[in-house]
UniProtKB/Swiss-Prot annotation:
Protein name: Uncharacterized WD repeat-containing protein DR_1725
The UniProt record lists the keyword NAD: no
Keywords, comma-separated and alphabetical: WD repeat
Domain of life: Bacteria
InterPro entries attached to this UniProt entry: Quino_amine_DH_bsu, WD40/YVTN_repeat-like_dom_sf, WD40_rpt
Transmembrane segments: none
Chain positions of WD repeats: 53-89
Organism field: Deinococcus radiodurans (strain ATCC 13939 / DSM 20539 / JCM 16871 / CCUG 27074 / LMG 4051 / NBRC 15346 / NCIMB 9279 / VKM B-1422 / R1)
Species classification: Bacteria, Thermotogati, Deinococcota, Deinococci, Deinococcales
PROSITE patterns xref list: WD_REPEATS_2, WD_REPEATS_REGION
């Protein structure tokens, strides 16, 4: 049963609503953590468990129904905010989990690992997964036809929330960006690496460091690890044009404008 505790909280909230927050106090008692979830000044629920002692960050779904707690001990907690209950603990094959994301309609969850203890080997466990929240079930993986793409903590959606694009840093380097259906997780297109200019010493093209979709979801803008921006057809993966090299600040501004205006 949850226990009432003094509030000496470490704020660990990355909330979709400015009014929602999760305050977590560690070591109360030793080895445990205590969480109080608020909507503004209203306490929604509180809990004390061992699992909360390892939490490093928290994130709410856009509708405020769900909460995920990220940890540095190889798991992610999913909580139902309305019921004040922990729904599931997802087990990761590595210690520190840096991110997890909800879809804009709050019905799906993206993880950069398999999510439970059933994978047959370590590499199976590292496959990014896509979950339905009600009912809670894994719908599939987000690695398409290759292990070098998928969700690794970087995902963005079109204006309607129907498509999503990932820029993966799996296996220690920028890989191809990929576009998926945000309801089913089905792959739509793998965007080829941005080709190097003629005469360059490098071959094979540069992987994606970041990516955005146009508001209508029909085009994608990719910022590659070589510092260039390139525009793609998000359905066919055709490279439409390479905009050229920009610094990270300029790239960020162009990516955000593209997501807002498609320009």
């Amino acid at each position: 049963m949850p226990r009432l505790i003094p509030l000496l909280a470490l704020l660990l909230c990355a909330s979709a609503s400015a009014e929602l927050r999760a305050d977590i106090t560690k070591g109360t008692p030793h080895g445990y953590g205590a969480m109080k979830v608020y909507d503004g000044q209203t306490l929604l629920f509180q809990a004390t468990t061992r699992g909360l002692s390892a939490v490093t960050a928290s994130k709410f779904s856009p509708d405020g129904r769900w909460l995920v707690n990220l940890t540095d001990q190889g798991y992610v907690q999913l909580w139902d905010v309305h019921k004040g209950e922990r729904v599931k603990t997802f087990l990761a094959p590595f210690a520190r989990v840096l991110n997890a994301d909800f879809t804009p309609d709050s019905t799906r969850l993206l993880l950069n690992f398999w999510g439970d203890s059933t994978p047959t080997n370590f590499w199976q466990g590292t496959r990014s997964s896509f979950w339905s929240l009600e009912p809670l079930q894994r719908l599939g993986t987000l690695d398409g036809k290759g292990w070098d793409i998928g969700y690794s903590g970087n995902v963005h959606f079109d204006a309607a929330g129907k498509r999503m694009v990932t820029a993966s840093f799996r296996f220690f380097g920028g890989q191809a960006a990929a576009v998926y259906d945000a309801a089913t997780g089905a792959p739509i297109a793998t965007l080829s690496r941005v080709p190097y200019p003629p005469g360059a010493l490098q071959t094979g093209g540069a992987g994606a460091a970041d990516a955005r979709l146009a508001p209508d979801g029909r085009r994608a803008l990719v910022y590659d690890v070589a510092g260039r921006l390139a525009e793609y057809d998000a359905a066919t993966s055709q490279l439409l044009k390479v905009r050229g090299k920009v610094d990270s600040a300029g790239a960020g501004a162009q990516l955000e404008r593209f997501a807002r205006e498609g320009k």
